[in-house]
Regions:
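Short coil-to-helix segment of the ABC ATPase nucleotide-binding domain corresponding to the Q-loop/switch region
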Residues: 62-70
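Conserved ABC ATPase signature
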Residues: 103-107, 111-113
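Helix-to-loop junction immediately C-terminal to a conserved catalytic motif
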Residues: 17
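Conserved ABC transporter NBD signature motif
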Residues: 25-33
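Catalytic Walker B motif of ABC-type/P-loop ATPase nucleotide-binding domains
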Residues: 128-131
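Conserved signature/switch motifs of ABC ATPase nucleotide-binding domains
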Residues: 102-105, 123, 155
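ABC ATPase NBD coupling module
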Residues: 34-50, 152-154
């Protein structure tokens, strides 16, 4: 998902995860009608969607493990053994299993984003929304995070990612949508003969 600053990329993402009301038109996501979405339904919507933010949104007063445990408890998990196993599984998947005891401020930006991606995977979401997931990262770390997201996508997960980084779009060729003038368009790659 591309577009200039202020084109509506983040607003679209926020609408998809229930943070903003759908203003006009129709829309549904993972079985929820965005026009009729009620406040009490939002937690259930978010259990089906993994969200990755540009600024990570990790709790600095908790370890990596406790950040993920917090999410599991908040989404209704009860069994401690299952929660521990799930946390280990997602941390292993993003290459952060050995850093479970660290606080977010002890991690690099790329490591924090890996933890944020692990958090998004906790409830086996149908869709992952990634809003500028490489926006605060250097080019090398951005490629590493994109490689990870690409690997997750290849495992069968759908990902909608907003970005300003056109180099990443060129390197990781996927369907591209553009926000412009309050509308959404599919960008069709042009081929030369």
């Amino acid at each position: 998902l591309i577009g200039k600053t202020g084109s509506g990329k983040s607003s679209l993402m926020k609408t998809l995860y229930g943070d903003l009301l759908l203003q006009r038109g129709i829309g549904s996501i993972v079985g929820f009608d965005l026009k009729k979405l009620k406040d009490k339904e939002i937690p259930f919507l978010r259990r089906k969607i993994g969200i990755v933010f540009q600024d990570f949104k990790l709790l600095n007063d908790r370890t990596v493990f406790d950040n993920l445990l917090f999410v599991l408890k908040a989404t209704g998990w009860k069994d401690k053994t299952s929660m521990k196993a799930k946390i280990e599984e997602v941390l292993d998947r993003v290459g952060m299993k050995t850093k479970y005891y660290k606080s977010p401020y002890e991690l690099s930006g790329g490591e924090q984003q890996r933890v944020a991606i692990a958090r998004a995977l906790l409830n086996d979401p149908e869709l992952i929304l990634a809003d500028e997931p490489t926006g605060n990262l250097d080019p090398k770390t951005s490629i590493e995070v994109m490689d990870l997201l690409n690997k997750i996508h290849q495992s069968g997960k759908s990902i909608l990612m907003a970005t300003h980084d056109y180099a990443l779009i060129v390197k990781f060729k996927q369907k591209t949508l553009k926000c412009e003038g309050g509308e959404l368009f599919e960008v069709v790659a042009q081929t030369t003969p």
